[in-house]
Regions:
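Structural/interface elements that position substrates and couple domains in central-metabolism enzymes
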Residues: 1-340
Length: 340
């Protein structure tokens, strides 16, 4: 049985996900899932699982304060021999701080700690959870690993045991690798732009190679957004900066992504001479397809850039909440350019 602690008393998930509301409703009606706003409900639980999304600021810097706040509210009620699992995104080194925090704030508490980073994707979170390619369990406790294997027993995938620090770095490395793949695609796209080649044809050749593969992140977009990839890149850079270790590849990935987002204004200014007084229509407002969230979405960042150059912007999106056109034809009326 699962009890969710939810201070805001949400009756629906804060982010819409396919199948999620149905899954919640089914398990509530069958008595396996309850929600409370009382941290005292932790008292009889064998496992405390912290899953809050770690917020990032406008510079993609992560803030783990929410994780420590939740721990502090829960600690007085934890029973002995509890298993504490964190799946929120943590900069490497945070698990060590969490363990020390618990020992100081609740001296005498017997507990095991696991860092098991989530690997969900907005718009496909339920499917990702039930069909993972692997589960990473970062812990120094053999007992904790056995318990995690029992929890994940229904999942048909490898369960990888490692230290909490290795699990933290694995999460950073995965997103850094994906971001680096995208940055490579941006560079090749620039080559195509200057040589008359078609980046989509080049991409077909790349993904047909078994050493690269059809799932490779090679979309020649205007850059990655949403804060997820940037959060891990910045976390690695910040940690290594403290040790005076340079990471030129990862640093260049962040710079390329920033430069890439400016490409839209460069191209449109080249076409029109100036964007002042121009009407630009953007098709799609959300962070990615399949979700209504606007958090750090690329279209909204592009909108802000275009308006900064004096353009007016209309946006079409049928799912996003806000002042957006729900008719693509209406949104396109009078537009000097359409971005999709």
């Amino acid at each position: 049985k699962v009890s969710g602690i939810d201070e805001k008393k949400f009756t629906v998930p804060p982010v819409a996900e396919p199948k999620l509301e149905l899954l919640i409703s089914k398990n509530q009606s069958e008595g396996r899932l309850t929600y409370h706003d009382d941290f005292g409900k932790v008292a009889d639980k064998d496992v405390l699982w912290i899953t809050m999304d770690t917020p990032v600021n406008d510079d993609d810097k992560p803030d783990t304060k929410i994780v420590f706040d939740l721990l502090e509210k829960s600690l007085p009620f934890m029973k002995q021999n509890i298993l504490i699992v964190v799946s929120s995104q943590l900069p490497v080194g945070t698990s060590k701080k969490i363990i020390e925090f618990i020992k100081v704030r609740r001296a005498g508490l017997k507990f095991d700690y696991v860092y098991s980073p989530e690997n969900l994707r907005l718009g496909n979170a339920v499917n990702c959870f039930f069909n993972p390619e692997r589960v990473v369990v970062g812990t120094g406790s053999a007992d904790a690993f056995v318990k995690m294997k029992e929890i994940f027993a229904e999942l048909n995938c490898p369960i990888l045991k490692m230290s909490a620090e290795s699990a933290e770095v694995a999460k950073h490395a995965l997103n850094a690798f994906l971001a680096t793949s995208l940055t490579f695609a941006y560079d090749i796209s620039d080559v195509c732009e200057k040589t008359g080649a078609d980046i989509l044809d080049v991409k077909k050749a790349l993904i047909s190679d078994s050493r690269i593969g059809a799932k490779a992140y090679l979309d020649p977009s205007l850059g990655f957004s949403g804060g997820t990839l940037g959060r891990d890149l910045n976390a690695i850079l910040d940690i290594m900066k403290e040790s005076s270790v340079a990471l030129p590849v990862i640093a260049s990935v962040l710079k390329k992504n920033t430069d890439r987002k400016n490409l839209v204004t460069v191209v449109l200014n080249r076409e029109f001479g100036s964007l002042r007084g121009r009407l630009i229509t953007i098709i799609g407002a959300t962070y990615k397809a399949g979700t209504p969230t606007l958090r750090r979405s690329l279209p909204m960042e592009v909108k802000k850039m275009l308006e900064g150059h004096g353009a007016s912007v209309k946006i079409f999106d049928v799912r996003a909440e806000g002042d957006f056109s729900k008719d693509p034809y209406e949104a396109a009326v009078g537009a000097d350019a359409i971005l999709a």
